[in-house]
Amino acid sequence: MFVKELEITLENGMKISGELDLPERQGQWKTIILFHGSGSSDRHATVESMGGIVSRNFDLLSEGFVKARYAVFRYDKRENYDIEIIIRDAREVTRFVSGLSEVEGILFYGWSEGVRVCTTLVSDFPNAQALILQSGIAEGWSSYFSYILRELTVEKLKELDNNNDSILEISDFLNCIPDSTSISFSLYLLILGTDKDGNMKFNEELDPEGKGRFSIIDNWIPLADEIVADPTTLIRFAENAPGETWAGILDDIKKIQLPILVLHGLNDGWISPVEAVQIAKAARNNADIILFKGLGHSLSKVSSPLKDEGGTIEDEVIVRVVEWLKKNVE
């Protein structure tokens, strides 16, 4: 692999650093641009948890694609949360890459939030040849939060309910340990807190009288329903909550007349595999879909959606993507 370090100057004068990974120093190549998931991310798609590195999956994707004789462009993400800025940066990055002498045509690879970025951008670039969409949201924030709050969190609460009476008590949560799953997002943002003495307590919206218990049916479900109906209401719990009632990508997908490969793990603990099916259906004859048993949001091995903390993408995924590319883009 030959690596060409590049710096992109944006219209506002700010700079983005990236690299073009090439099979050889000379020649023109079909070039896959990698678009990150949500939050802070670099050209490696580094995911960290508890002070350690969980994965750098863009390194593995790039290595696999370059071996298959594709070039890869990846970059250090500048903006963490404002989707309009993220898309604007991605558009300028794509325009820059399209003009490089080594680039014959471009392909989009989006992971999670990157799926939204890809489907928003692709119509601006007539030299785009294909899209690879991994673990993306089809129907917007409401479906995203419905899966996490109504399905996965309810499943976890029932698992924690020692009395099987749909009433959760503080003692049911004493063995919970924070991790990087969507369940921890629910537990530590929406359910659990501490009092002035540092003791565990429940959110006042679930336990307004401070009795140390709440009902799944009477307390949790109404809160979940409120957030699903209007995800912007999450702002009272998290400052980086969605500031929009985004309805998803299906309208954009229906307009795309390019080969599309949809990838999703059946044990994804953040985005329901149903979303992948919706994307593939919207693309009609343009799409192929691969659903991977036992893999999670990062297409790494995961035993359950409730335990999806991310991890190293499986080699099988890269092999399947390369096979699809050889068949549909060559």
Model-derived regions, located:
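N-terminal cap/lid segment of alpha/beta-hydrolase-fold proteins
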Residues: 1-27
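Accessory cap/linker subdomain of secreted extracellular hydrolases
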Residues: 134-251
